[in-house]
Amino acid sequence: MKLFSIFLIFTIFIIASALVAAKSAADVTELQIGVKYKPASCEVQAHKGDKVKVHYRGKLTDGTVFDSSFERNSPIDFELGGGQVIKGWDQGLLGMCLGEKRKLKIPAKLGYGEQGSPPTIPGGATLIFDTELVGVNDKSLSEEKSTSSEL
């Protein structure tokens, strides 16, 4: 009986360790930027202070989509670097070309922090955004290009 109890405690410890390691692997501590598509010509680039228009799909690390401008067919517009969006966006969209698509993996400290944004975004959540820059100041993509929901 004592041997079984030790075995059971050891098994529970191993499973708990694996779960903690799996969560840690999904979380990031620094902003990660992946370029998914970049136009051959980059004549218009996003800089701090520019008014940008961005299509996006936001997901948690488990794949749960919490928001998407693609489904609404309504990109968000804001001043880049002006603190109107989460810090991960202000940093991750800098230098993006008009028509470029990026995947941003944003740690909680550059997202919604430890408080999250209940009920859809839990505290401490790493966020994943598929983004497409569809407008910079007075320049924009044609409607045909900006309505694609596949990144």
Curated annotation (Swiss-Prot):
Enzyme Commission code(s) on record: 5.2.1.8
Pfam families: FKBP_C
Cleavable signal peptide: 1-22
Control of this protein's activity: Inhibited by both FK506 and rapamycin.
Keyword Isomerase: yes
Keyword Secreted on entry: no
Residues spanning the membrane: none
Tissue distribution of the protein: Ubiquitously expressed.
Location within or outside the cell: Endoplasmic reticulum lumen
GO biological process: chaperone-mediated protein folding
Domain of life from the UniProt record: Eukaryota
Keywords from the UniProt entry: Endoplasmic reticulum, Isomerase, Rotamase, Signal, Stress response
Catalytic activity: [protein]-peptidylproline (omega=180) = [protein]-peptidylproline (omega=0)
Gene Ontology terms, MF aspect: peptidyl-prolyl cis-trans isomerase activity
PPIase FKBP-type domain: residues covered: 49-137
Inducing stimuli: By heat shock.
Gene3D superfamilies cross-referenced by the UniProt entry: 3.10.50.40
Role, per record: PPIases accelerate the folding of proteins. It catalyzes the cis-trans isomerization of proline imidic peptide bonds in oligopeptides.
Sequence similarity: Belongs to the FKBP-type PPIase family. FKBP2 subfamily.
Name assigned to this protein: FK506-binding protein 2
Species the sequence originates in: Vicia faba
Annotated gene: FKBP15
